[in-house]
Regions:
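Nucleotide-sugar-dependent
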Residues: 54, 102-111, 118-139, 144-157
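Conserved donor-binding/catalytic core segment of Leloir-type glycosyltransferases
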Residues: 38-54, 60-64
């Protein structure tokens, strides 16, 4: 809308609220064991669609670099999509990448909570008109986020607004590994980012907050028309 030169004061953004309840408490160690994730592995989990737009070849390349470098980082792609089989073939059996089928809701939330880092990965040059829905799920988990996305993208803006994670350039697999390793080496920062995301979810992405913003918008509009 801003690119169409609409006056800034005429634009009001009201975020969709998250459909997920607060994540139930779960045993992260038990979940990791069930999913085959090692206690000493740094699990970077991407959930959701595996399509063209996600550009997940970047993750495959990052996994290959991680294996060659002897990194503790392991990437997990959870879900399905029209690119999944192609990604499996391109991965070529690397030990630093695994695929997990879509899970029932409770198991899905447990998996998010058990991961060390949650990932949004986008194809370079992709400019979304909306925030990826996975981000609201990520924030609910209380885990830090890495967003591999172009600067100035909608996703980059949401990461900055929430303070919930780190942004790296889209299509840069080594930057992805460095970001994951930096969070693993700084657990205090990781906890802070995760807590920021949960706070953002509760204060900005809750149904109560969204309805309050709608009320405020309608009242402001009514008052302006009454002048």
């Amino acid at each position: 809308v801003h690119s169409l030169r609409a006056p800034a004061e005429s634009v009001k953004v009201i975020r969709n609220w998250t459909h997920l309840p607060q994540a139930p408490k779960s045993d992260a160690s038990a979940t990791r064991l069930r999913l085959g994730w090692g206690a000493d592995e740094v699990i970077v989990l991407h959930s959701g669609n595996m399509g063209k737009k996600q550009g997940l070849e970047n993750v495959v390349e990052a996994a290959k670099h991680a294996e060659a470098d002897g990194s503790a980082v392991k990437f997990v792609l959870m879900g399905d999509g029209n690119q999944r089989e192609s990604l499996v073939q391109k991965a070529g059996g690397t030990s630093r990448l695994s695929f997990v089928d879509s899970l029932p809701q409770e198991d899905f939330q447990a998996a998010l909570h058990a991961a060390d880092v949650l990932l949004v990965n986008e194809l370079p040059g992709v400019k979304d008109m909306s925030v990826p829905s996975k981000l609201t799920s990520y924030f609910t988990s209380g885990r830090p986020v890495i967003a591999a996305t172009d600067p100035g993208s909608v996703t980059a803006h949401e990461i900055e607004a929430s303070g919930a994670g780190l942004r790296v350039d889209a299509g840069d697999p080594r930057a992805l590994i460095r970001a994951a390793e930096s969070l693993a080496a700084n657990p205090e920062l990781a906890r802070e980012l995760g807590a920021n995301g949960l706070q953002f979810r509760n204060e900005t992405l809750s149904k109560t907050a969204a309805i309050a913003h709608y009320d405020d918008f309608i009242l402001t509009l009514a008052e302006s028309r009454g002048r």
